[in-house]
A protein has these predicted regions:
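A short C-terminal boundary segment appended to hydrolase-like catalytic domains
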Residues: 38-68, 373-430
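N-terminal active-site segment of His-dependent metallophosphoesterases
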Residues: 34-139
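Twin-arginine (Tat) signal peptide motif
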Residues: 1-7, 33
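Conserved beta-sheet core of the metallophosphoesterase superfamily
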Residues: 279-400
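N-terminal export signals
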Residues: 5-27
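Active-site environment of divalent metal-dependent phosphoester hydrolases
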Residues: 102-104, 128-130, 163-171, 224-227, ...
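Extended active-site neighborhood of metal-dependent phosphoesterases/phosphodiesterases
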Residues: 63, 67, 75-76, 135-250, ...
Length: 430
């Protein structure tokens, strides 16, 4: 499909994001007030952080968006939430994923975040590695992606990143840590790694007393010792080490005891209702997983303060995992999981496909524009859909227990269902 034709199709999705200007659908909440210092006319309806743009002009360029941003501040009277009078800011996250060498998009997205977002989260696949691509080429792609961030992150917005399956092929864990770990350390200076050469770690952001501290956990589903597996196998296999799971349990328990809210980020999502797990089941020679409920079970136990003692057998014979969590009076407040991989904007809750359990875990998947068209996005996983998303801004409100999500680009669900330009998503089931 030629690009011009695609843009015409993408125009069908214009109602999903609004045409030219700020959507006013959420102005009814009198408790939400805009910061008018960034408003072009000095007054506007209350809105989450949204730039005005003209969908008809969209050609994969975030630079087309007019710089009209709102720094939302919310005021509430004394109520059962106990926050008192005053204002508080939401945490603003720029989420990008699966850019696959399209570094112009990386630069535009990082530029968008300057002075507007509190953190940038990249959920992997900066490169386009495969078993046919050598180590030097893979490292070159990671270096170019890193340079794209460094060249545009002038205000030093904290930057967090995790491995994608196309990043790790034919390179070692040490290679990736040197290439991307140093980039993360340069902007998220207080990041705490799980071990000296690991790419799993956590980073805390305290917004204010009302919002509290949010702890970001970067997870590594390609956690192999250098030389442990052939490079091609690391491309195909999702595997946690016992050391990472022990770290995860300890770090989540510490968050619960300190009252930190938690966001996890990884290239893949969780649960056997996820698209990527279904694909792995359908073609086990292409992708393979440990138990898809290993991490959800851990989070669930710490959310409810219950015990979990279990041996998670790995049917592939790669890495069995032991979990031993004792009961606790502390309760983990879990916000969401950020992921990529499937080249599709998604939101759903982790659950067992047989209906036996629903986890209180919100999954938020990010898409990306293709540098060479949109072949994967438009047809591979969701026929009859348009999924040309550049990035999303997520406003996390820990008082309302919700996330305001705004995506930049064109999106039309495969079933033709309407999509709000601003999506308000509760992150707790109850």
């Amino acid at each position: 499909m030629k690009r011009r034709r695609f843009i015409k199709i993408a125009g069908l999705a214009a109602s999903a994001f609004g045409l030219g200007g700020i959507d006013t659908a959420m102005a009814a909440d009198s408790n939400v007030q805009p910061d008018l210092s960034h408003s072009p006319q000095g007054s506007a309806p209350a809105q989450p952080f949204v730039p005005a743009f003209d969908q008809a002009r969209f050609e994969r360029k975030l630079a087309d968006f007019e710089p009209s941003f709102y720094s939302v501040r919310v005021g509430r009277k004394n109520d059962d939430k106990g926050i008192g009078y005053g204002w508080y800011d939401r945490l603003k996250i720029l989420h990008i994923s699966d850019t696959h060498q399209y570094n112009a998009l990386v630069q535009e997205a990082v530029t968008l975040a300057q002075g507007r977002c509190d953190v940038i989260c990249n959920t992997g696949d900066d490169g386009n590695g495969s078993e046919k691509v050598g180590r030097e080429r893979s490292l070159e792609w990671l270096e170019k992606a890193s340079n794209a961030v460094r060249s545009t992150n002038a205000s030093n917005v904290p930057y967090l990143a995790v491995k994608g399956n196309h990043d790790v092929c034919n390179i070692t864990r040490s290679d990736y840590r040197r290439a991307i770990g140093s980039l993360v350390e340069g902007y998220a200076t207080s990041v705490v790694w799980g071990s000296p050469d690991a790419m799993f770690g956590h980073y805390d952001i305290k917004i204010n007393d009302s919002m509290g501290t949010i702890r970001f956990l970067m997870l590594d589903p390609f956690d192999y010792e250098d030389g442990q597996f052939p490079a091609v196998r690391s491309f195909m296999t999702c595997t946690f080490s016992q050391a990472q799971i022990d770290w995860l349990v300890a770090t989540l328990r510490d968050a619960a005891e300190k009252g930190c809210k938690v966001i996890t980020m990884m290239h893949y999502s969780f649960g056997d209702n996820s698209i990527e797990f279904s694909e792995a089941e359908a073609k086990p020679d292409a992708e393979s997983y440990q138990d898809p409920f290993l991490v959800p079970d851990i989070i669930d136990a710490l959310q409810h303060g219950t015990a979990l003692k279990k041996l998670y057998r790995d049917s592939r014979g790669i890495q069995d995992i032991r979990v031993n969590i004792t009961p606790s009076a502390s309760r983990l407040e879990y916000i969401c999981h950020l992921f990529g991989h499937i080249h599709s904007k998604n939101q759903y809750r982790c659950r067992k496909s047989d209906g036996s359990k629903d986890y209180d875990m919100l999954m938020l998947g990010e898409a990306a524009l293709g540098a060479y068209g949109n072949a994967l996005n438009k047809a591979y996983r969701y026929p009859n859909s348009v999924n040309d998303i550049a990035c999303s801004v997520l406003e996390v409100d820990t008082v309302e227990k919700c996330i305001y999500r705004v995506s930049y680009g064109s999106f039309m669900p495969y079933d033709g269902s309407p999509v709000s330009r601003i999506t308000k998503i509760p992150y707790r089931m109850q």
